[in-house]
């Protein structure tokens, strides 16, 4: 019985997150109250506060769920491409772009992040968390690029930090621009080519090479 109750609580929590995601996308984060989320979800405000401290906590949970899915995907591709970190990286980047088009939850989240969230007031704490995630992502990307170098799949003198910054800006920019004007280009159809362009830049761009040092 206790197990069923725990399962029901988890289902209620996920339902609240799904409803909040939809309302945030429709109305913007600052214009959506916890009371509106409770009403739309068919639960009491008390139920909302039982699961989440406040709106920023709820929003952070939505973001963290998205991030955890990427981690699971990485493990899946590592099993599919053992000893081939560049293919793992390529497929993850393609998935990130394609899923922005094909997966409603991810698309709504990206719309909110890029276009429908003001990081002021109670949401200021979320902005700091996003900054921390951004810095952590640079570290993760850089580590992945170093693995590719060790596997002799990228140039040994690649400036990995600069390459990591470029990657995040490039992928984020593609998603943000497509979400703003979906009719302007076919992100799903062209995702693989955009990723190929990025990785070819790492292979061929001289400005991404560490300058030779004279001893």
Curated annotation (Swiss-Prot):
It comes from the Bacteria. GO terms for molecular function: DNA-binding transcription factor activity; sequence-specific DNA binding; toxic substance binding; transcription cis-regulatory region binding. Gene3D superfamilies: Tetracycline Repressor, domain 2 (1.10.357.10). GO terms for biological process: negative regulation of DNA-templated transcription; regulation of DNA-templated transcription; response to xenobiotic stimulus. Residues 10-70 form the HTH tetR-type domain. It holds the Pfam family TetR_N. Keywords: DNA-binding, Repressor, Transcription, Transcription regulation. InterPro entries: DNA-bd_HTH_TetR-type_CS, Homeodomain-like_sf, HTH-type_Tx_Regulator, HTH_TetR, Tet_transcr_reg_TetR-rel_C_sf, Tscrpt_reg_MAATS_C. Residues 33-52 bind DNA. PANTHER family: ACREF/ENVCD OPERON REPRESSOR-RELATED (PTHR43479), ACREF_ENVCD OPERON REPRESSOR-RELATED (PTHR43479:SF11). Potential regulator protein for the acrAB genes. This is HTH-type transcriptional regulator AcrR. It comes from Escherichia coli (strain K12). The gene is acrR.
């Amino acid at each position: 019985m206790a197990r069923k109750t725990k399962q029901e609580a988890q289902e209620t929590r996920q339902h609240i997150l799904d409803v909040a995601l939809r309302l945030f996308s429709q109305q913007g984060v600052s214009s959506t109250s916890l009371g509106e989320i409770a009403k739309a979800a068919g639960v009491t405000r008390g139920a909302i506060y039982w699961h989440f401290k406040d709106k920023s906590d709820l929003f952070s949970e939505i973001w963290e769920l998205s991030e955890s899915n990427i981690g699971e995907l990485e493990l899946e591709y590592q099993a599919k491409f053992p000893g081939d970190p560049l293919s793992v990286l390529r497929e993850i980047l393609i998935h990130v772009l394609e899923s922005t088009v094909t997966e409603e939850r991810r698309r709504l989240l990206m719309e909110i992040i890029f276009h429908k969230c003001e990081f002021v007031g109670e949401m200021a704490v979320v902005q700091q968390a996003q900054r921390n995630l951004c810095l952590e992502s640079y570290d993760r990307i850089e580590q992945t690029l170093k693995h590719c170098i060790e596997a002799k799949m990228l140039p040994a003198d690649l400036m990995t930090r600069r390459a990591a910054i470029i990657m995040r800006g490039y992928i984020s920019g593609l998603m943000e621009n497509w979400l703003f004007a979906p009719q302007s280009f076919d992100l799903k159809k062209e995702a693989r080519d955009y990723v190929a362009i990025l990785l070819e830049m790492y292979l061929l761009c001289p400005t991404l090479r560490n300058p030779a040092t004279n001893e």
